[in-house]
Amino acid sequence: MSARPPLRAAVVGAGRMGMVHGHLLQVHPETELVGFVDRDTSLAEHLASQGLRAPLYPSVAALYAAAPPDAVFVCTPTHTHLAVVRECLARRVHLFVEKPLATSRADAEAILRLATDAGVTHAAGYVYAHLPVVQAAHDLVAAGALGELLRFTAHAYVSEVFGPKKGWFFQKEQAGGGVVANMASHVLFILGWYFGAIRRLVASTRSHFSTVDDSAQVLFTFANGVTGLLDTSWSVPGTQMLDYGLAVDGRNGTLVLRRERILLHLLAPAAGHDAGWSEIHASDLPADTAFDVSPHIGGEAFYRQLQSFVDACRTGVLPFCSLAEACNTQRMIEAIYASAAAGAPVDA
């Protein structure tokens, strides 16, 4: 148990992701869940039935008057993020915003400016980047194990959409898009974290069942010269959990990242690894997670994400998943949709 006072945190938005973050904040030894905010106050009974003990307030102002937090987690529909962030920053609170950051690059950059001007710690909810295997693969790439980076292939698939869908999540104006904005953005964040800013891309999207994009193919050129292809769909049968992967080629070898392991082939020894094939399994990596909310889907990443945010709030040093990095992801999302609409490459 930490000797430091807990980070007092509130959750704005009492939907699915709001409840996920609420549970984490309630049980983490360094945080205290002080309240939820949602205009639908009838949700209080549902929250209580799920074991969430914090009170529900009808507005941010009501929360601040009754139980002022140190940090706020924004888990409302994407199109509301900018307005909610502006309201939350009426007082100085640290800021966590669920992904995607906004429905447009302009709104995402406005959110970043608000947080920067307020001088608060900030982070975005790209949780898969917190998986130990994803972080270990990043460290190998950053350490130069592969030598000069050349190209990559990536994918993100899940079995979710096989017919008409209703709700804000499937309305482009409210969700910002379909599979690209709301699922593949996890992989886009990882690509940006590994390779930096993009220079140009060309994309195609298709709507098979819903009114938003259900699949997409994207060819990237990054500013550092790395090129690669992303294929994604949430209409792939037989994939109940998100299946993501990344293969990176460099002049000194190849790295293949999957959910539970890294396969590494080096032409010459580098970064503490011998030449030839080696495997790094998730179980080989340091276990620094106090709890795992859902082991079968890599739930340890949620704990690590929260711990990263708490540490950043304590130290004032922004985490790698800051809103600035999320804006890089938003630039990719917007460029993908622009290219698909134009049927032509887009400079980003």
Feature-to-residue mapping (PLM):
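Contiguous beta-strand/loop segments that form the cofactor/metal-binding neighborhood of enzyme cores
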Residues: F189-H265, Y303-G316
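Predominantly a Rossmann-like dinucleotide-binding segment in NAD(P)-dependent oxidoreductases
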Residues: Y128-S210, L219, G343
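N-terminal Rossmann-like dinucleotide-binding module
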Residues: M1-G51
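C-terminal glycine/acidic-rich active-site capping loop/insertion
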Residues: V127, F222, G245-A247, R251-A324, ...
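Beta-loop-alpha module in the N-terminal Rossmann-like domain of NAD(P)-dependent dehydrogenases
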Residues: H21, A54-L114, A301
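Hydrophobic residues in well-ordered beta-strands that form the structural core
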Residues: V97, H122-A124, L257
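Rossmann-fold dehydrogenase core element
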Residues: E109-Y128, G147-F152
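C-terminal capping/lid region of NAD(P)-dependent oxidoreductase domains
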Residues: R4, V120, G147-L150, A338-A348
